[in-house]
Amino acid sequence: MYFRPCEVCGGVGSELHHIIRRSHCRALIHCELNLIALCPKCHRSSKGVHGKHGHELDHKLKLDFQNKLEMLFDKEYLTEEIINDVLKISDSALKGLLKPLKREKEGYERISVIRQIMGGRLYEWKY
C-alpha cells in the first residue's frame, strides 16, 4: 500500500496498478510511466480496473497512457536513446521491447513503438 491519493477518485490507501498488464508487455514491469496509484475501490471492486464491470475505467487508463506516449514521443522515428529517456527501463527490457520491431535507418517508427508498448494494439475513444 502506498501513501499517494488515488489518481482516479482521490481516495486513500492506494495500490500501484500496471496500466499495461505485465503479460501484455513485460518490458514495462518497472516503468514508472506504466504505474498508477489506485484506491482499493478503483483497483479491485466490481467497477475497478480488475472488476467484472471495470472495462470502461481500464480502457480510459490505457487510452490516457497511450495519449501520454504520443505526446512524449514527438518525432516520426525514435532511437533507442530517445525511447529509454522516456521509459527509463533496463537495457535488457528495452532490447526485448524493440526486438520484434524493424529498425529503419532513421530509427524505429513512432507508431510501431507505441503499439508495442501498448501490448500490441492501439486504443481508440469509445462513444
Question: What would you call each of these model-derived segments?
Answer:
Residues M1-E15, C39-K41:
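Short cysteine-rich loop/turn motifs with clustered Cys
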Residues G13-A27:
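Short recognition patches in nucleic-acid-associated and regulatory proteins
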Residues R21, C31, T79-E80, I89-S90, ...:
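Alpha-helix initiation/capping motif
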Residues S23-N34, R44-D85:
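Polybasic, low-complexity binding patches
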Residues G54, D85-K99:
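Short, basic interhelical loop/turn and adjoining N-cap
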Residues F65-L69, L94-L97, I114, M118:
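Generic structural signal of hydrophobic/aromatic residues within well-ordered alpha-helices
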Residues F73-D91, S112-Y123:
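Repeat-unit-sized solenoid/scaffold elements
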Residues K99-Y127:
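Short Lys/Arg-enriched helix C-cap and helix-to-coil transition segments
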